[in-house]
Amino acid sequence: MTLVGNFSPLVLVGDSDRVEAETVGAYLDGWAGHDKVRLATANAIKAILSGAGRLVGRIARGYLPGDPGKLVGVNSDQDQQKSIDVGSHNLFVELLIAAGVASILSEEADLPVAGKADGLVAVAIDPLDGSGNVGLGAPLGTIFSIFPADVEEPFLQPGNRQIAAGYVSYGNSVDLGFSVGEGVIFATLDPVSGQFHITRRNVKLPERTSDLAFNASVQRHLSAGMQAYVNDAFLGKDGPRGRNFNMRWLGAAVGDMHRIMQRGGLFFYVNDSRPGYEKGRLRLVYEANPIAFLAREAGGKATDGSRPILDIVPQTYHERSALVFGVAEELDILGEYFVK
């Protein structure tokens, strides 16, 4: 008896045998019209989604073809690179160059990769966020920013010059969250058609939250203000906050972003007293910037603890930054602890 064969999806009560929702490609075509920069942006996003579809196919196979977490090198900051890090980098670079972008900045390369000389947009990307989760069944993702390529150093522009930003979350479904400056849109990959179909438009963060996302094991290394905020939250309804809080920490910024965009919350990965963490750990250009862009479009906020992320002018390609993002009200409350 064959235990498994070609899978046909389980059909639930109320399921349709056809997906009628608009595709992301069709949405982008309508948004772009005949505008050259918008067309270039749309083509770049389509290339990323094509890469995401191919990447998730490899993720789903786990260790069957080989070890995706095999160490193969280090990047410019001496972070260990896994086989799947390098493979996903090569995949997205190839597709983005074919899409006609001017240049690509990837976490896995020291310098930007040159693309089309007369390209109109530049793409900053973390090809595989959370690669420490490879092989564990925990969240992984791809996150990107698209900038106009009308300046000499497109990746050293402040985040408020982003044309578009987004992420793909590889979880129990393959979900896209993106914005072209007209609100946040969610879409899900249909493995049957190979297309991302829109599931929600104009996504907004709630006005209040009781969910926090941070690494509690480093609490003792945080600033006095941050420790006071955490302590007050953990006192729950018996403390000064007057309500109970939950904690979530997925170990991948994309995973936490996707959860917060749907359920609300406040994420913080800030600078602390540990060596190498003085300025935070996330990358400003291709992690903090796209998250901040999406948070703003959803009615939330993102700061480095004092400055809006989108106002910061990067000094280097792989500059690190502290990051706090999520529900605006809670971020404002946290800000009060920084000045106490």
Swiss-Prot record:
GO molecular function: fructose 1,6-bisphosphate 1-phosphatase activity; magnesium ion binding
Residue numbers binding Mg(2+) 2: 126, 129, 287
Residues in the signal sequence: none
Places the protein is found: Cytoplasm
Cofactor: Mg(2+)
GO biological process, one term: gluconeogenesis
Pathway(s) this gene product operates in, as recorded in its UniProt entry: Carbohydrate biosynthesis; gluconeogenesis
Note on cofactor: Binds 2 magnesium ions per subunit.
Catalyzed reaction equations: beta-D-fructose 1,6-bisphosphate + H2O = beta-D-fructose 6-phosphate + phosphate
One annotated Gene Ontology cellular component of this protein: cytosol
Entry-linked Pfam families: FBPase, FBPase_C
Protein residues bound to Mg(2+) 1: 107, 126, 128
Binding site for substrate: 215
Keyword Metal-binding: yes
Swiss-Prot/TrEMBL keywords: Carbohydrate metabolism, Cytoplasm, Hydrolase, Magnesium, Metal-binding
CDD domains associated with the record: FBPase (cd00354)
EC number(s) given by UniProt: 3.1.3.11
Predominant location: cytoplasm
Quaternary context: Homotetramer.
Family, as annotated: Belongs to the FBPase class 1 family.
Protein name (record): Fructose-1,6-bisphosphatase class 1
Organism: Brucella suis biovar 1 (strain 1330)
Name of the encoding gene: fbp
